């Protein structure tokens, strides 16, 4: 029987010691130990030349900060063969959402370029057809924290990582809406009680309540998601 290689994340970074970081713990960590996915953190400086192994230089046209050199990054990419698309973490990229996470999880893996300083020479991104991805509308000190967020979201979707598939199916974004509220023991806490319907044992009523809650939360907090959810619902209902 042909052995299937695990889904692989290859990180190109000047701080390889940041990985696996939190990905070495909990669900992702156990899955990593069990070989359900693999991770390689590659030090970009290992592909730089000169005494100081510099990976950056001043920008043409002037301006603040430094830019990561295309020749050094190109050597790192070619020197580290790995499956999957080259992903560059940047605030100007395609917004990371559950659709993109599913798309990346369905492939053989990803190569993630973690930028630093003012960013990466544009020619490098064009030469390699990099997929630019943003973790959100904010700026970080580098691409590593954003890469950790993206990889955690991906690993959760890999086969065998989460025991109950229904846990995935009921999470935020899986059906286009945010998730409903959760409750556990004690039944009364700080004068607040669990909604009666959840104690009823009536599964259909519980499902209907959870659906209403999810829809209300989505409509109130994320009108952009709500509009898409309603459009998709109307389309499915014909």
Curated annotation (Swiss-Prot):
GO terms for molecular function: tRNA (guanine(37)-N1)-methyltransferase activity. Signal peptide: none annotated. It comes from Paramagnetospirillum magneticum (strain ATCC 700264 / AMB-1). This is tRNA (guanine-N(1)-)-methyltransferase. It catalyses: guanosine(37) in tRNA + S-adenosyl-L-methionine = N(1)-methylguanosine(37) in tRNA + S-adenosyl-L-homocysteine + H(+). NCBIfam families: PRK00026.1, trmD. GO terms for biological process: tRNA N1-guanine methylation. CDD domains: TrmD-like. The keyword Transferase applies.
